[in-house]
Amino acid sequence: VQPFEVSPILFSFGLFLRLISIAWNKIHIEMVVHAPSESGSLIRLLKSLDAADYLGSTPSLTIELPQQADPQLLHFLQQTATFTQLSGHITLRRRIQPHHMDSAESSLRTVESFYPLDPETSHLLLLSPQAELGPSFYHYLKYTVLNYKQSARAKSVFSKLIGISLELPFSSPTADGKSFAPPEMTVKDKEQLVPSFLWQAPSSNAALYFGDVWAEFHSFMSNRLSTPESVTAPHTKLISERYPAFMEQLLEMIRAKGYYLLYPSFPGIKSSSIATIHDELYQHPEEFGATNPSVDERKNDPIGLGSGEQPLSHASNIMALLDLFPSGLPDLDALPLLGFNGEQLDATAYSKQTEEYLQQFRIYYGGCAKDTKTDDPSADLFCLQE
């Protein structure tokens, strides 16, 4: 680990001493991106990653290549002068199997692309090749991870937070693809946007997932794929085929465990964002490719990934962004919470929906009988011994 480097951001909230006390340099973020067969958009992402400020500790980047890798991308990666910061930090993994992946294979490949060395300090930043990140994205991630995951307060408060999205989508990832606007809160009798909110929706565009949660997702996927479904189980796909297949299983785990991600509202408040998702070079996931008629019909779909392509901030740090948090980052229980369908929930509705879906999941997908009793159903989604 490289020595701790002092950045201007660290002085803004009296963080310097706090960061030392909770071992800033023990936090490791590993970046993963799955390359499509045509990688023009990925090259744009790589350039933005190389231009970011990593506070003296460049994270690793794993690029998952398809069987038919783009020669232009390979040539770009082989040029010695291509990178300044990412040089020596990139790992390529190329798929061997010649056939197109189905949904199960794609989900497994995504989940297996990362496993934390230390679940408490190693975290996954999953990126879409359509993404482009601002130079200060790493500042924001470190700051929010420290506050909501690694701080003494975060460790003392029970939380269902599993990750942090860098982008604000302007449409829901669900199959209906309906437009989305961040929630408002009433402050001093006025409706206004808050800088962040919680949402029970997974993201594959630009999202950090905590290491312990991704390790749990490994176990979930192993049990999910090996447990026979009930003959009465519904097969309605909730996540749009614009997104990778693993999102469907991750949504299942999120709903069954009552999890949520932290999403930013500030792209809707400020004129720029720390992450934007481009649509002009968008390609559908391989597992939902040309053999699927429903995808063919949407190849000219202008929605793409529904990000709205917010202008990207080129600020070298997030000092201006942190003006939105004059008292520091808010407590999670003070933020609006949305269900997976975008409906705002209070604590009672949130608990009720989680309990109802949990019971359905255990019966339909967990191999559990209706009358199965357990002290903590959320800790035992699967009845593997029945």
What are these regions (language model features)?
Residues 1-126, 131-386:
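Peripheral/terminal regions associated with large enzymatic or DNA-binding modules
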